[in-house]
């Protein structure tokens, strides 16, 4: 199942007011736990952004990806969507990943509550040199992300992992085990499958990566994917996804997580391709 959604639709007057807009489900009202301590700053969402930097992505794509997140965070649409929540604030951390033991935090937990804090986070994202790593461990990224929520000084109504990637898991534990562990902790996982290149032997890309993400990676209430199929739409797709996440909205025709149906793509396809090719 494939879909697209425009930023204009998300921010159409009725949506910002809290009503339904075609293609977008209105957010469910939520309330904070009564036992939240006064000393803890409340936010609407705790968002972990987990970004793939494997060698299958070229340096230009990695640079555009970085710019996409930085520009999205400072965009008027993102800041407007953020203010639709009861707290009008989000907390986020941003890390890059490749193999099962290769994760680097670029932005530790930061609260965004307006243009000034958004600018500071965006500048921090852009100042770190772009790098690449070997192999692809989505499971490693999820396992790395989970304890970050326990270290977060802010408390949100939702906990979300936003994970991007251009290939299937081929390093570390199976992705479904990591996904299920996160779902067991009440964490939502959304996906940003990157499909701007045709699958090839040299890159270990697979057909229907969007199906793989839908059936093997994402999960939790309202989980969804935004697929990037055109390099020119890279930045808009990133912005659209972040807006949906901070506004607690999902596409009406969303993906149905694998827990509700059989996967259309084998969840161990990445491991099988690696084993067939390298024998280890």
Residue ranges, per PLM feature:
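Sec-exported extracytoplasmic/periplasmic mature domains
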Residues: 67-78, 99, 126, 130, ...
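Second-shell loop/turn segments in exported
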Residues: 50-60, 92, 108-109, 124-135, ...
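Bacterial N-terminal signal peptides
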Residues: 6-19
């Amino acid at each position: 199942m494939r879909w697209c959604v425009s930023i204009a639709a998300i921010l159409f007057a009725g949506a910002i007011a809290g009503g339904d807009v075609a293609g977008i489900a209105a957010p469910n009202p939520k309330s904070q736990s009564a036992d939240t301590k006064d000393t803890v700053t409340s936010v609407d969402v705790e968002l972990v952004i987990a970004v793939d930097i494997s060698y299958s992505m070229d340096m230009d794509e990695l640079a555009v990806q970085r710019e996409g997140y930085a520009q999205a965070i400072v965009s008027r649409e993102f800041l407007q969507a953020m203010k639709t929540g009861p707290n009008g604030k989000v907390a986020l951390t941003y890390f890059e990943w490749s193999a099962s033991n290769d994760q680097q935090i670029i932005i530790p937990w930061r609260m965004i509550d307006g243009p000034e804090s958004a600018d500071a986070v965006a500048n921090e994202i852009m100042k770190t040199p772009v790098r690449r790593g070997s192999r692809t461990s989505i499971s490693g990224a999820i396992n790395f992300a989970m304890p970050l929520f326990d270290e977060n000084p802010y408390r949100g109504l939702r906990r979300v992992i936003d994970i991007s990637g251009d290939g299937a898991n081929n390093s570390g534990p199976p992705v479904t085990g990591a996904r299920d562990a996160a779902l067991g902790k009440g964490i939502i996982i959304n996906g940003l499958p990157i499909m701007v290149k045709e699958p090839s032997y040299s890159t270990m890309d697979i057909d229907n990566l969007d199906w793989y993400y839908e059936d093997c990676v994402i999960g939790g209430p309202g989980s969804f994917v935004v697929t990037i199929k055109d390099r020119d739409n890279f930045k808009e797709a990133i912005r659209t996804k972040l807006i949906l996440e901070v506004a607690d909205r999902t596409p009406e025709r969303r993906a149905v997580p694998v827990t509700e149906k059989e996967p259309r793509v084998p969840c161990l396809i990445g491991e099988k391709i690696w084993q067939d090719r390298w024998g280890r």
